[in-house]
Amino acid sequence: MSSSNKNWPSMFKSKPCNNNHHHQHEIDTPSYMHYSNCNLSSSFSSDRIPDPKPRWNPKPEQIRILESIFNSGTINPPREEIQRIRIRLQEYGQIGDANVFYWFQNRKSRAKHKLRVHHKSPKMSKKDKTVIPSTDADHCFGFVNQETGLYPVQNNELVVTEPAGFLFPVHNDPSAAQSAFGFGDFVVPVVTEEGMAFSTVNNGVNLETNENFDKIPAINLYGGDGNGGGNCFPPLTVPLTINQSQEKRDVGLSGGEDVGDNVYPVRMTVFINEMPIEVVSGLFNVKAAFGNDAVLINSFGQPILTDEFGVTYQPLQNGAIYYLI
């Protein structure tokens, strides 16, 4: 029993693959035959893929010629010039006009990128100095110069601006030990209106007091606003007036002319036991300042050599760090 195509559901119907086969062909041939023929013909046509063009692999000779042309100033060659370049490069290998054109475009883009990167990275000047303001000591002594390692001493109430008498006696005074105060073995001197003096009591640097000591306002050794905040030590200033009766070796001065009253040699700041102290530049008398048994070492742990009187062979370095043992 057979039935015509017009009685089939629409989902099985398909259009003819060729316009020459008209309605009469549909009646004679079932629709599924047309469907299979269409698929077969389309599958055969899809297999006909054109061969890909070979990729251009430039030869070293071709690259050298292109670079020389680009460096000579030819950045965007016209079509006629591209053809002449292509003919010249064909001697070393296969190449097309499009390859030449795109090479110049890419070369121009790379040159612009290199120039842009060069302008965005300026060179550091040798005169620039690096300052590290991150340590706790910077809040007291200012910034630290990385090249010299010096701590600039700021203005402080403890810095003596007027002449004052300053002695380095080498005798033991019990009253000085009672008025001295400090940190461990290192005792801090106090600047008074009558001057200040050091003595060697218990191998520490102590104070000789007078009757006006109670009139001196309290000194904030920890910096800050005076309310106990902070942990910084203000720089101590050694007055520079030299007593004429004191020997030159006792005040840390080397030979030369006699030193009289009201003589102000050059001052410098050194750090002894992490505290800044201003001393006279030149040779320093360790025994006169800190006692007969005192030994001064540098930041490398090497002792500072002195003669039999305690005078250093070399002057102390400005801004250097020393330790008293």
Curated annotation (Swiss-Prot):
It comes from Arabidopsis thaliana (Mouse-ear cress). Keywords: Developmental protein, DNA-binding, Homeobox, Nucleus, Transcription, Transcription regulation. SUPFAM superfamilies: Homeodomain-like. Transmembrane segments: none annotated. GO terms for biological process: cotyledon boundary formation; cotyledon development; embryo development ending in seed dormancy; establishment of cell polarity; positive regulation of cell population proliferation; regulation of developmental process. Residues 51-115 bind DNA. Induction: Up-regulated in the zygote after fertilization by the transcription factor WRKY2. Up-regulated by CLE8. Belongs to the WUS homeobox family. Expressed only in the egg cell. Not detected in the pollen tube. Expressed in the zygote, the basal cell, and later the suspensor. Expressed in all suspensor cells, except the hypophysis, and in the embryo surrounding region (ESR) endosperm cells. Strongly expressed in the suspensor cells, with a weak expression also detected throughout the developing embryo. It is found in: Nucleus. GO terms for molecular function: DNA binding; DNA-binding transcription factor activity. Disruption phenotype: No visible phenotype, due to the redundancy with WOX9. Wox8 and wox9 double mutants are embryo lethal, with embryos disrupted as early as the first cell division in the embryo proper. The keyword Cell inner membrane does not apply. GO terms for cellular component: nucleus. This is WUSCHEL-related homeobox 8. Its main location: nucleus.
